[in-house]
């Protein structure tokens, strides 16, 4: 529970107002109220009443997975893919959470009970292996996983999506299972913090001379009219937005190559953009100090942005 100095006093309780506009990929303002209702181990509870064991392996080892999905004023975008990815991450970490199929219904209930139906919102779910005496080996017998989920409303700032962003390049110091949506994100946060402190909006990783992805985004390039992105592998997260961008691009007849781009080919890049659940499609106009194209969002990027937005509007009905 934050102290009075850390938050706003509301009816004797405390809330936190967080503005990430100085460094977020797509600047957004969110409001986390500790009087909101969250999901915890099968129950809906006020956030302030939730307690987690200090022996939880998520706390001790970052032994867990997470998923984030976006609510568009009436629906979740491609919830099925988020559900599939969640189950895969759980399998890869050998966490047996019996309620994994409930994620969509839990997410919908959190939106409803927190009265977020008519605005943009996000739902975060985290599942750890559970609480047990500290040991590098898995608990024997198995313990019940710890599941926590909450929702919050936000107002996207479209400036970055319209004007483009500048990003840095950095050697990829993460582990070799980036395909798992693990809560072990310290290399990502350290790298993103460095980008923020340098006035940049994202950190793009380079592994052995190959550009892989961002600290919390996938990245695409346009070279000679062809759309490039790193192929699915253990070095990138299979982004839900990434998958849908590839589908949209194919439908528009854009040439696609799921092929790694070498750092030394940046001089040939005419356009680039990043993608994730919260920032959708955000143009990159400067990469590692190199201005891309004319320094403004390019035609392929804007086409994909437009088609993505039209799809969202169509789903709203």
Residue ranges and their predicted role:
Residues 8-10, 28-32:
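Leucine-biased recognition of intrinsically disordered, low-complexity hydrophobic segments
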Residues 236-239:
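Short, contiguous acidic and Ser/Thr-rich linear segments
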